[in-house]
UniProtKB/Swiss-Prot annotation:
Keywords: Cell membrane, Membrane, Transmembrane, Transmembrane helix. The chain crosses the membrane at residues 13-33, 84-104, 111-131, 219-239. It comes from Ureaplasma parvum serovar 3 (strain ATCC 700970). This is Uncharacterized protein UU183. It is a multi-pass membrane protein.
């Protein structure tokens, strides 16, 4: 086989491998149920893998509400970083495969392969965007923190009314509550305020609800449908390609019978020739006929 043809074949194989790996990996990450998210007292100061690709860490000083306010960091976790690396490798293999098709000028024979590859590329891009969208950490963690802060301040009997109002001033500013000069009335207004934790969007696939649980968003059903169709199409196509390759290899390995140079294909006898004694009667007849 020509060197360029070998490279072209291997570019096909590598692209198929990366396509299937990315499609399966990103699909799993896109439908993974998020972990518990919020202002978790027992995990303050630790990195918490909340979604499949993102983690957050709350500053431990946020617990000292007398001098500090809420502060937290968001970053990609190991799965998120691995997903970016895998996606870059997939894009490079896709481009390399296109280059090889162009070099050997095999656009027409590779038309079906290109159509399937582009469909898979669009599906992978769709999944990659979904898993890379940053979750709604800000609203969820803030709601959780201020719910905790309000309960702590109202239950702390050592604080004066003025001190409670000073500490809860961040609560008032965050939720845009009216500023009231009377400390007792202001605290009453804060106590009546209800924080909305129902049906908040966490990421494209899940919504966040009170009591720290998640429900499926409408988009996840669209993801199931799109990826299901792509799975079926790619499975049928690649299965047919594998069968075709196996049949081709089988034909090449068939043992053909060697023909004689004169064009005849005579099989050799396995049995040895038997030696037959001459018939006396026939000999007498031949002598009479002078044969």
């Amino acid at each position: 086989m020509d060197k360029k043809a070998k490279i072209y074949t291997w570019s096909h194989i590598i692209l198929i491998v990366f396509s299937l790996v990315c499609l399966h990996w990103f699909f799993i990450l896109s439908i993974t149920i998020p972990n518990q998210t919020g202002f978790l007292i027992n995990r303050v100061g630790q990195w918490i893998n909340s979604s499949s690709t993102y983690a957050y860490k709350i500053d431990p000083r946020s617990l000292f509400y007398l001098n500090y306010t809420l502060n937290f960091n968001i970053a990609l976790n190991a799965s998120g970083i691995a997903s970016i690396v895998l996606f870059i490798c997939y894009i490079l293999t896709f481009i390399f495969n296109l280059i090889m098709i162009g070099i050997i000028r095999s656009w027409r024979p590779s038309l079906l392969h290109l159509i399937i590859a582009i469909l898979i590329w669009l599906a992978i891009l769709y999944l990659f965007i979904i898993i890379m969208i940053k979750p709604n950490f800000n609203q969820i963690i803030n709601n959780s923190y201020y719910t905790w802060l309000k309960n702590v301040i109202f239950n702390d009997q050592t604080l004066t009314l003025n001190k409670k109002n000073v500490i809860l001033n961040t609560y008032i500013n965050h939720y845009h509550l009216p500023i009231i000069n009377d400390p007792q009335v202001a605290l009453l207004d804060i106590s009546k305020h209800q924080i909305n934790n129902e049906n908040l969007t966490f990421n494209p696939s899940y919504n966040y609800n009170a009591n720290l649980y998640f429900t499926k968003a409408k988009l996840i059903y669209c993801t199931y449908t799109i990826i299901g169709i792509i799975f079926i199409i790619s499975f049928i196509y690649y299965l047919s390609e594998i069968i075709k390759r196996c049949l081709l290899v089988n034909d090449n390995w068939k043992i053909k019978q060697h023909e004689r140079k004169d064009g005849l294909n005579i099989k050799k006898r396995k049995n040895k020739q038997e030696i037959v004694a001459p018939d006396p009667i026939l000999e007498e007849i031949f002598k009479e006929l002078d044969l």
